[in-house]
Amino acid sequence: MKLKKFFALALAAATLALALTGCGSKAGDSADNSDANTDNQTGETVTVKLGVVGGIYDDLWAPAKAALADEGIDLEIVQFSDYVTPNNALANGDIDLNAFQHRIYLQNEIDNYGYAIQNIGNTFIIPLNLYSQKVSSVDELKDGDVVAIPDDLTNGGRALKVLEAAGLIELDPNAAFNPTVDDITSYKVNITIEELKANTIPSVLPDVAAAVVNGNYALDFGLKTDEAIYKDSVLDVEEYWNLIAARTADIEDPDTAAIYEKVVEAFQSSATEDVFNNTFGGYFIAVGWDQDLINQ
């Protein structure tokens, strides 16, 4: 990003404005004038590259992108086709921010690869609900029934927590937020758990007794939240909250941190919530917007 040039121009514009008016102003007013002059007089724009996974994020970030443009910030959405590359790209400086993962996934990436990146703002949580085309309630599931869950560690672990909350299994509490099937200590109903790729699970609903489906895939397949036989009850668990990530070194720079704070604030808006509710039928739920993670 052209941050040094951006702030040098902003300072020059603010100084000129003070000289012309010949009167004092509060620091906050001066900063506001500086931003306006940078946008309106010089036309200089700061570009922030945001890495995401999936076209759905274009819609989710559309209100923020429009709001930031008015402040002289061009939010460039950079699409990735997998969940491995975005953190590597962020750590290497190919992008400035990313927004595709929850806290558990980010921490696993940091632990495994040593990335110096961090959470700077909460975005949403996507429910993992239990669906069925064979039964209308959890109570109807019986011994021998097959229940499908995602096969990746983070979503699979969360799916097992859903099954536990639904009263189907018990998990070893020491497994915390990343349990595997090996951490099942007892079956309250002797179901068979089948681990599948998350994006394939909705298509196998006719063939299994029930399945835990990621909210984004449920949305793609036209599944409605009120059709679930059990709804995700762990929405208040912060470890499952999705987030915006940045390089730690950038957050330690006040000028860069100020730009990124605007990005977070632009996303955490009523306009974004309207997209959650009106475009995506409540599958995205705003969480943790009251937490200031940049200035903590």
Positions of the model-derived regions?
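A bilobed periplasmic-binding-protein/Venus flytrap-type ligand-binding module shared by bacterial periplasmic
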Residues: P127-V138, Y240-A258
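Periplasmic-binding protein-like
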Residues: G157-E164, E265-G288
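Short, well-ordered beta-strand elements
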Residues: G43-G55, I73-Q79, V146-V147
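Bacterial lipoprotein signal-peptidase II cleavage site
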Residues: L20-T42
